[in-house]
């Protein structure tokens, strides 16, 4: 049956008509081809905003550097990055006065957390630039290659288990005259072809030792790899994002943790909270502003937009901020916190794959890798690219990278930049004029509230705020920010009008079928609808329609229409046969051609549980048979997580309940990867998985604790098994003979 999607809005209050204005249903745009152009754009723009700063050449890397701090004050409304350090420090002093003890407490907590953080913290995170192979790898792999390569250079800090000794190794590695590391080289072998004349050339990946000089190593350690940001809606042009290497990650982690401790205690910060907690914080801020409004006065709200937030910020400001925040901390911790901003102010951007050019006859295409961009005549590029390359020239390094000292890349210091934004909001007033401002800040997004006796004074306040921000290197966009009376604004895609407007249109893209497997998809679909009823004000009629839409979508995706429907097809043939031979047809899962019995009352129950008592015994036996090879019991234990992609903002993790049945299959990975140099990675992964399974067999999950101390996994397991064996022997569950055998085995293992 066809359902009109506008039924989704049957019982929604009028303000929520905002939901109808989001045309975000289809697939978002993905990038393809080279991202080099976007990265070069970022490099050029960032330098343009800072071009009146101090220019010099780095003693270490030989790169062209620009320092815009304390640069000339702007004379127009164009974006500029000339933050005045004394203004930044004064804003932080005011924050310190308003929140006595906050900086000390945050520093103390961050320091204590750092002392107990282990190296494995760095395995969290997605792609990481791996300096040994000069491309992105999963975070755990990049950490592993770094640690194994460090060992070749007598840097064994990681073996102590803590993050601090590993970070000490990173600092030491920057001073080594040369670094040895493992890289992967393809060795070509000529083999006679079996089925025809001639030879086959076979590539065999080999792990080889390689070495690079100090300068080359430092350049790699400071490199950020760049990609194009995917799935960004509502923009014509794509933009570049960056991935830092493992050397930078450990230091950034600590600074961000420090900033997070501060943000948690600032009422103006929209981070690190989210969801309903964030809404409560916002509502409080609005109520507070309205209650502070002078009698007969007016309260205005600016829905703010900052121009190029990241590109106008500067690592040197962040250095000043960490120094100020950690003022009362031990010197070693202050030094530790200063490393991330220092590394960032010397960062180098890798430019990606390079450009494609075509021959004059348009017959041949060639990819020009980044190191060779300037080795071919500029006339060969189109006009747009030619203009870009001319501007890039002063900052280009011969390895095909670009020096990028000013500016921050996307997503690197979200928390610390939020602290800077809140510092601007916390000033409240300049020169005791007759207005007061306050607001909310979440990374680059802000909302500004201004109270005053009349509209003109409010405007005066907004202009003063604009100028204050300029002094901190923040550029509020006059074109894109708009002002209303308080009570109606938007902040981080939450629309406020006398309360938060329900806006589930943002979630519409995630209402589809997730594509994990039939069992998980049903659970995820229902959980999303349930969550939207709880969090986004989705009404009952709407939810009922959403269930029907989802079931229709699910049946089309998995070609599992009802057994009594007229749909033809390979799978339908089997489903119809099952339908004919089943007595309790209500007990068939939707994936097996059964009816849908979900409604608003039972959304939270997994389908197998819901239909359990309606199933035929034979069907139930097949569906849930533990020996059935399709019942993936290991992969599902209680709660699972899925990645959900809303129309805006980052991918969200979502928990759902799942019961394991024959529909909980897991897909096999792509086989073509087995012939590449990543094969070693897969073999290592499998080895780790086996180790972890063995460890879990020794320690049941109830006895997991964060590892403290210097035991290896092997010693811990041997120790645990000895204890278990002794308990079994003493209680009579184990014979003397078996006990002695077990102890002998463990004795051998313990000495490997």
Swiss-Prot record:
RdRp catalytic domain ranges (all copies): 286-482
Gene Ontology cellular-component annotations: host cell cytoplasm; host cell nucleus
PROSITE patterns assigned: RDRP_SSRNA_NEG_SEG
Short motif (Nuclear localization signal): ranges: 187-195, 203-216
GO MF annotation list: nucleotide binding; RNA binding; RNA-directed RNA polymerase activity
Ranges that cross the membrane: none
One Pfam family this sequence matches: Flu_PB1
Alphabetic keyword roster: Eukaryotic host gene expression shutoff by virus, Eukaryotic host transcription shutoff by virus, Host cytoplasm, Host gene expression shutoff by virus, Host nucleus, Host-virus interaction, Inhibition of host RNA polymerase II by virus, Nucleotide-binding, Nucleotidyltransferase, Phosphoprotein, RNA-directed RNA polymerase, Transferase, Viral RNA replication, Viral transcription
Catalytic activity as recorded in UniProt: RNA(n) + a ribonucleoside 5'-triphosphate = RNA(n+1) + diphosphate
GO biological process, one term: DNA-templated transcription
Signal peptide: none
Presence of the UniProt keyword Transferase in the record: yes
Compartment(s) where it occurs, according to its Swiss-Prot or TrEMBL record: Host nucleus; Host cytoplasm
Enzyme class name: transferase
EC number assigned by the record: 2.7.7.48
Similarity-based family: Belongs to the influenza viruses polymerase PB1 family.
Function, in words: RNA-dependent RNA polymerase which is responsible for replication and transcription of virus RNA segments. The transcription of viral mRNAs occurs by a unique mechanism called cap-snatching. 5' methylated caps of cellular mRNAs are cleaved after 10-13 nucleotides by PA. In turn, these short capped RNAs are used as primers by PB1 for transcription of viral mRNAs. During virus replication, PB1 initiates RNA synthesis and copy vRNA into complementary RNA (cRNA) which in turn serves as a template for the production of more vRNAs.
Subunit structure: Influenza RNA polymerase is composed of three subunits: PB1, PB2 and PA. Interacts (via N-terminus) with PA (via C-terminus). Interacts (via C-terminus) with PB2 (via N-terminus); this interaction is essential for transcription initiation.
Family annotation (HAMAP family): INFV_RDRP (MF_04065)
Protein name, UniProt field: RNA-directed RNA polymerase catalytic subunit
Organism (species): Influenza B virus (strain B/Ann Arbor/1/1966 [wild-type])
């Amino acid at each position: 049956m066809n359902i009109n999607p506008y039924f989704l809005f049957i019982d929604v209050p009028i303000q929520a008509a905002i939901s109808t204005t989001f045309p975000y249903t289809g697939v978002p745009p993905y990038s393809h081809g080279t991202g080099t152009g976007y990265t070069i754009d970022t490099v050029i723009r960032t330098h343009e905003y800072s071009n009146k700063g101090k220019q010099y050449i780095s003693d270490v890397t030989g790169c062209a550097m620009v320092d815009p701090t304390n640069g000339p004050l702007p004379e127009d409304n164009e974006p500029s990055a000339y933050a005045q350090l004394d203004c930044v420090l004064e804003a932080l002093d005011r924050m310190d006065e308003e929140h006595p003890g906050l900086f000390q407490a945050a520093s103390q907590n961050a320091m204590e957390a750092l002392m107990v953080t282990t190296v494995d913290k760095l395995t969290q995170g997605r792609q990481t630039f791996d300096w040994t192979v000069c491309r992105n790898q999963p975070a755990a792999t990049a950490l592993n290659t770094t640690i194994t390569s460090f060992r070749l250079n007598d840097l064994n800090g990681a073996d102590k288990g803590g993050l601090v000794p590993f970070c000490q190794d990173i600092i030491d590695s920057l001073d080594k005259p040369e670094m040895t590391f493992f890289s992967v080289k393809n060795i070509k072998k000529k083999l006679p072809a079996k089925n025809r004349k001639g030879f086959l050339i076979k590539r065999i990946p080999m792990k080889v030792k390689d070495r690079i000089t100090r300068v080359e190593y430092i350049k790699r350690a400071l490199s950020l790899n760049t990609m194009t940001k995917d799935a960004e809606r509502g923009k014509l042009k794509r933009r570049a994002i960056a991935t830092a290497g493992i050397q930078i990650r450990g230091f950034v982690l600590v600074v961000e943790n420090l900033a997070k401790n501060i943000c948690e205690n600032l009422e103006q910060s929209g981070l690190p909270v989210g969801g309903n907690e964030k809404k409560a914080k916002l509502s409080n801020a609005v109520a507070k502003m309205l209650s502070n409004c002078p009698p007969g006065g007016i309260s205005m709200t600016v829905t703010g937009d900052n121009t190029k937030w990241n590109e106008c910020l500067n690592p040197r400001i962040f250095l000043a901020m960490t120094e100020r925040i950690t003022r009362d901390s031990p010197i070693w911790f202050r030094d530790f916190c200063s490393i991330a901003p220092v590394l960032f102010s010397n960062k180098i951007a890798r430019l990606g794959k390079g450009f494609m050019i075509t021959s004059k006859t348009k017959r041949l295409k060639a990819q020009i890798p980044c190191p060779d961009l300037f080795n071919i005549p500029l006339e060969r590029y189109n006009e747009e690219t030619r203009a870009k390359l001319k501007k890039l020239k002063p900052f280009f390094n011969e390895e095909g990278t670009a020096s990028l000292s000013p500016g921050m890349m996307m997503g690197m210091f979200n928390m610390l930049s939020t602290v800077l934004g809140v510092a601007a909001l916390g000033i409240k007033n300049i020169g005791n004029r007759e207005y007061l401002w306050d607001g909310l800040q979440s990374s680059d997004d802000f909302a500004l509230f201004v109270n005053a006796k009349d509209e003109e004074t409010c405007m005066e306040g907004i202009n003063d705020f604009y100028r204050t921000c300029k002094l901190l290197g923040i550029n509020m966009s006059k074109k894109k920010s708009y002002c209303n009376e308080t009570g109606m604004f938007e902040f981080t895609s939450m629309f406020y009008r006398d309360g938060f407007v329900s806006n589930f249109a943002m979630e519409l893209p995630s209402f589809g079928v997730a594509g994990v497997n039939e069992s998980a998809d049903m659970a995820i679909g229902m959980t999303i609808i349930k969550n939207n009823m709880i969090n986004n004000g989705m009404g009952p009629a709407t939810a009922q329609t959403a269930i029907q839409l989802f079931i229709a979508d699910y049946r089309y995706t998995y070609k599992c229409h009802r057994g009594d429907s007229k749909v033809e097809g390979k799978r339908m043939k089997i489903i119809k046969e099952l339908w004919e031979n089943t007595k309790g047809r209500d007990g068939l899962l939707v994936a097996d051609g059964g009816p849908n019995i979900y409604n608003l009352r039972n959304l939270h129950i997994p389908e197998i549980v819901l239909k359990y008592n309606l199933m035929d015994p034979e069907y139930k036996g097949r569906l849930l048979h533990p020996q059935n090879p399709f019942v993936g019991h290991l992969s599902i234990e209680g709660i699972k997580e899925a990645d959900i992609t809303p129309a805006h903002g980052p991918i969200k993790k979502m928990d759902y309940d799942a019961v394991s049945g024959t529909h909980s299959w897991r897909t096999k990975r792509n086989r073509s990867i087995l012939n590449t140099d990543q094969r070693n990675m897969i073999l290592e992964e499998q080895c780790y998985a086996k180790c972890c399974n063995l460890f879990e067999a020794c320690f049941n999950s109830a006895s997991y604790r964060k590892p403290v101390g210097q035991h290896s996994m092997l010693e811990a397991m041997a120790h645990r098994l000895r204890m278990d064996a002794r308990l079994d022997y003493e209680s009579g569950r184990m014979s003397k003979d078996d006990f002695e055998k077990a102890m002998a085995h463990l004795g051998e293992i313990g000495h490997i």
